Regions:
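Short amphipathic alpha-helix with an adjacent loop that forms part of the alpha/beta core around
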Residues: 40-49
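Acyltransferase
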Residues: 180-197
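A short beta-strand-loop structural module common to alpha/beta enzyme folds
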Residues: 30-38
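Extreme N-terminal starter segment of soluble prokaryotic enzymes
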Residues: 2-8
Length: 197
């Protein structure tokens, strides 16, 4: 990385938010935290001063999370985005995908996640272990995204655990890399910073 990466962090009122903030700071990033009830114009004006927008986990649906979805839409083409859990779901919604109740509610469960062994997941164990905390899931992936990590479900179905829009530099993960249940979470966050800058 050249210079100190600057992260604009959108806090969606989640108890995990500051664990993520701490991880980015530990890796040398300067992190500016704003809550999702901040006016959109205030956040939009700050985007160009940052290398990465992080959309945090949070409760509820993406559409109900304050300025989350409109901010993501205002960010496209201006700044890379990393969405975690609710942030991942919001990327899907902002780009025309769909989010629905998950077939299983999972809160604090370690899961085996498969991946495409490319990009931020290159060289990760196949599968790797990640912490899941969600009751919603992306059920229709937007056309511009490719699924890069998933969980094998009954009947051969794949539940998206990560997706990326390469052209617009949008990356979302359903699992929580900052959780102690995610063995390589710190490595993933370090790679996300490198990817962004």
């Amino acid at each position: 990385m050249n210079g100190t990466p600057r992260v604009l962090f959108l806090d969606n009122f989640d108890s995990f938010s500051y664990n993520l903030v701490d991880e980015f700071q530990r890796l040398g990033a300067v992190v500016e935290v704003w809550r999702n009830d901040t006016p959109l114009n205030v956040l939009s004006e700050r985007l160009d001063r940052h290398d990465l927008l992080v959309a945090s986990p949070g409760p509820g649906r993406p559409e109900d999370a304050g300025v989350l979805v409109p901010l993501l839409q205002a960010t496209f083409g201006r700044c890379p985005v990393f969405g975690v859990c609710l942030g991942h779901q919001a990327l899907a919604v902002a780009c025309g995908g769909e989010v629905s109740p998950a077939s299983q509610l999972v809160h604090g469960k370690a899961a085996d996640v498969n991946h495409d062994d490319a990009g931020v997941f290159a060289g990760f164990d196949r599968p790797f272990v990640a912490g899941r905390y969600h009751s919603l899931a992306v059920t229709t992936v937007p056309d511009t995204f490719r699924v890069t990590a998933w969980i094998e479900m009954d009947g051969g179905r794949r539940l998206p655990m990560a997706m990326e829009d390469v052209e617009r530099r949008l990356l979302g993960v359903q699992f929580h890399p900052e959780s102690v249940l995610s063995r390589d979470g710190s490595v993933l966050i370090e790679r996300v910073l490198a990817w962004a800058v």
